[in-house]
Amino acid sequence: MRLFARLEVLAILACAVPIAAIPSFLSNSYPAHPAEGVSLFPQTQPQAPLGLWTRLRNTVIERLWRVPPQLNKNRPGKQGKFPLFSAPVSLRARYGDDVVLRFTIRNAEEVKALAEASNILFLDVWASTDEWVDIRLTKDVVPSLLGLLPQSLQTSHIPLIHDLPQTIYESYPSSSQRSSYDVQGFSPSTKHSSDITNIFFQDYQPFSVIVTWMRFLTSMFSSHVQIINIGSTFEGRDIPALQIGVWPANNPKPRKTVVVSGGSHAREWISVSTVNYVAYSLITSYAKSKHVAELLQQFDFIFIPTLNPDGYIYTWEVDRIWRKNRQETSLPFCPGVDLDRTWGFEWDGNITADNPCSESYPGEDPFAGVEAKQFSQWAKNQTAQNNIEFVAFIDLHSYSQQIRYPYSYSCLPNPPNLENLEELAIGIAKAIRLTNRETYEVSSACEGFMASQAKAKSDDPFPRIERTGGSALDWFYHDLNVKYSYQIKLRDRGSYGFLLPRENIVPTGQEMFNAVMVLGRFLSGHDGFGHLDWEDESQRPKADEDDIPSENELGENDDSWIPFDYRNHDDQNEGEGYDNDEWGFRRRRKG
């Protein structure tokens, strides 16, 4: 009965709305003009007649939710001319007139209305903060969305990405090869250039190249690197990882281990490249930096470039903005489980399990996601059988530049070591800021989906745009007792979203490498940032060795170690809410 009811509801909604989680095979039939209130699309295609399903959907929405019909009738852009795009026809056939809109939110009522409308229309929510929400949809659906929203939201949005197919096209490597692509048969290159100047981190890399690169590193640096297997994917692929560390012989103590994972969501390519960059920097710095050498003697590091190889490969071969894994669901046309909503701790899939087409579908049961279950079993086996003590977990995602600590599922319980979690998170944010002057916000993971009390001017937080139970962050922290667990959302703040240009790979990697160095220093019991190797070639900004004071020259809140380029930098407008004392490590651990 449950399955029948689910299919009945989905059948009705399928007639009323396009499903965002399904590749848009018919998207090139969508009209190309925006709704009222969206006047920033530069050039649009001539208006196409509405299809039968589109007209039926609009009628259902108008009658059930009382959408004013004029929103669908008086749409601008009828005189627009078709621009000359360089994106191939195959991409335009898949993504049609998809755009990304940013809605500015001001109160709880607006957030609730936006969340409900997104669920009704099966829209793809790209990111959300306490100030804005980014949503991907076709221009043809904009009138339906606006009709479900209050008047204030109908005018408080801007198009963030005007032309999704073009932006997707530009995210694939490589620009030098694009001229040879057949416009009618575009396929992104999966072969890395042999040019020595086109090094590994100058572009995003497909999974096959990443695995080959990992094996190469293992053979070149066998003294402190080995490749391991976390488990198998739904489609039978290995989930490879790099284990980095100097393993002492005959040591009965549990080996302290840090896990850095990326690519749970397939479309978040920058997280995959960043995991690789940090791993490479630690590996190659071992013989150059005494601080890195000390770190690898004290800790093992496990780097998992992508927990979701099936989905990652799918983003290269079929759909660049695919989010979930590729396993089967109860609806054959809606495959995939969200690998960051399927973990066993505070799994809330009983609320959303009826909609396999949702981008956040958690599966029908806890650990329904094959790769998440494999990862959890591997982690448990390591602690039970291999004398491993996990001391930190960093789960890299994109985008919005946030550092989040537990809990994700709710703001009501405070973590027992909340003060230490905040202290380390603030230290990581400072290291990032001093690397490339990028600002990352620090908050509990639940607050990442809600407005702060200061913004809401109330003790009641904003409602959630999407469910956040069943996260890897909460499971590692609570069930595996990993005291320092973080989810870090990388660059950018929405200009490109998941389609971050390749020029950001190295600077983002530099920021996270310094973040990991701060993490290691914190776990080692050191004060301040004295062991950050700013003179190391893997990090930025650069300074002469003589410019870095020794550890005993550093005071608790002394910033004299900062490279000369930043010593006179005005911090007043950065890191709002944190004074200079709050940025320093304040030695207040509670064990």
Swiss-Prot record:
Requisite cofactors: Zn(2+)
UniProt-annotated glycosylation sites, renumbered to this chain: N350, N381
Biased composition (Acidic residues): 544-559, 573-582
Main location, first listed in the record: other
One cellular component (GO) term of this entry: vacuole
Biased composition (Basic and acidic residues): 533-543
Compartments (UniProt record): Vacuole; Secreted
Protein name per UniProt: Inactive metallocarboxypeptidase ECM14
Species whose genome carries this gene: Paracoccidioides lutzii (strain ATCC MYA-826 / Pb01)
Gene this chain is encoded by: ECM14
